[in-house]
Amino acid sequence: MKDLDKLRNDLDMCDEIIVDALRMRYQIIQEVTNYKQENGIEIVQPEEEERKKKFVLDKLGDYKYKKSVLKVYESILYRSKRIQSHELFDFNIFLIGFMGVGKSTISKALQRTFAMDVVEMDEVIAKRNGMSISEIFELHGEEYFREEETKLLRESRNKKNIIVSCGGGV
């Protein structure tokens, strides 16, 4: 059996191969992004993502660590999608509507689709104030809460590639 130093050296070589492969993959992703931009092709192509996942599943077969490899691969796909969305989709998405119409549900779907960060305004305001929204209303009043919403909206103008799920009163 190999000694521990030799095994660690083998792992280092594997890591080097992984890093080189990722660098090459992300370079190709940049080329795909450029091609999509030049030719007006949609950012999201779910059929291509499914084809890639099927390829990996077929390649892994009944491999003992299949679930772990799939998790890593899903992360690679997510990061690849994020690179594309940041290049091709250079703005924010604001979801506005009454309470309970599904802004949070839609923001999660958009997050999966475009690999963008989500800002749930009510959650951010509650966290910043260390209390629930109803407690903020009770303690500080609606005017204070609306000022907090406005402040957060202004802050979001300075960010790119985010999905903002606005509170029901925006």
State each model region's role:
Residues 95:
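Hydrophobic anchor at the beta1->P-loop junction of P-loop NTPases
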Residues 104:
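Walker A/P-loop
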Residues 1-91:
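Domain-level signature for soluble enzymes in the chorismate/prephenate branch of the shikimate pathway
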Residues 120-170:
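ATP-dependent small-molecule kinase phosphotransfer cores
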Residues 101:
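ATP-binding Walker
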Residues 98:
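P-loop (Walker A) phosphate-binding loop of NTP-binding proteins
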